[in-house]
Regions:
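Short, conserved active-site loop motifs that form the nucleotide-linked donor/cofactor pocket
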Residues: 90-91, 182
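Conserved beta-strand segments of alpha/beta enzyme cores
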Residues: 40-42, 92, 110, 142, ...
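Mid-domain beta-loop-alpha active-site segment that forms a flexible
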Residues: 67-83, 130-131, 201-208
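Hydrophobic pocket-lining residues that define ligand/cofactor binding sites across diverse proteins
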Residues: 86
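Active-site substrate-recognition segment that forms the wall
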Residues: 1, 8, 100-103, 107-108, ...
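A conserved short coil-to-beta-strand element within the FAD-binding core of flavoproteins
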Residues: 43-53, 71, 92-109
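Rossmann-like flavin
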Residues: 1-78
């Protein structure tokens, strides 16, 4: 809100789809856990499900409308405009790669860059995702941080119109309307940091989407992307001051 970024935040519902109701019933325990925490969903099947998203093949499927979701319409624009807001507040953005962090008396004192430059510091915030583990070692902190890689394809001229994200529970991926078109995303790849992308993973998702959800998908080609997200064994985020 402070950055005053317009039309970036969408409050919507999510359509969960299962190929068969039996698959949903087998997954009922997880839905009950959600309900216990105040996360509500409306069950749909037959004609009631068919009228929710006209471009989605719902024949024989079982669905749920999950309420209270929010999503970003363009994460890239969000990041760019947050960076602009940071500079308006007086911040400086250095386009440089950090090689190491120098510390003294167990406190960080200097950031060194791969080009030989360095910057003395009084305080340091490390928000480097999966790469944070490498930097934290320089100041004597070790956390069991692992990288998980996900893939997506953005299709600009898909011929598919969605009013909400569609999470295909039976296929393990999500289809989201974004400013750039239709985004088909999912999978978890366990691999080292900075792996060689295996974009066949993204292609498989698009093929599944066309075969199982979107018979009218005009194109299976689009811009492909791999993203790395940090993962802790207890799945909880690591946020707060260092000890």
């Amino acid at each position: 809100e402070a950055a005053q970024i317009e039309n970036i935040w969408a409050e919507n519902e999510v359509l969960y789809l299962y190929d068969k109701k039996e698959q949903y019933l087998a997954d009922r325990f997880s839905w009950q856990l959600r309900a216990d925490e105040g996360y509500h969903a409306t069950e749909l099947e037959g004609g009631a499900l068919a009228g929710v998203e006209s471009d989605v093949d719902t024949d024989g499927k079982f669905g749920l409308i999950a309420h209270g979701w929010r999503s970003f319409t363009d994460p890239q624009r969000l990041t760019r405009e947050l960076a602009q807001h940071f500079t308006r507040l007086g911040g400086e953005i250095l386009n440089a790669e950090v090689s190491r962090i120098e510390s003294a008396a167990s406190r960080p004192k200097c950031v060194h860059f791969t080009d030989g430059a360095q910057r003395d510091i009084d305080k340091l915030v490390i928000a480097a995702g999966c790469w944070a583990g490498r930097l934290l070692k320089d100041i004597g902190i070790r956390i069991p941080l692992a990288p998980l890689h996900g893939y997506h394809t953005d299709i600009a001229d898909s011929g598919v119109s969605l009013s909400r994200p569609v999470l295909y529970a039976s296929g393990g991926f999500v289809n989201t309307p974004v400013e750039s078109g239709l985004r088909i995303a999912g999978t978890v790849e366990i691999a080292p940091l900075d792996p060689e992308p295996n974009f066949r993973r993204a292609e498989v998702l698009v093929e599944k989407a066309k075969r199982s959800l979107f018979p009218g998908l005009k194109s299976t080609q689009g811009s492909q992307w791999i993203g790395t997200r940090p993962f802790m064994p207890d799945t909880l985020p690591v946020i707060g001051p260092a000890p």
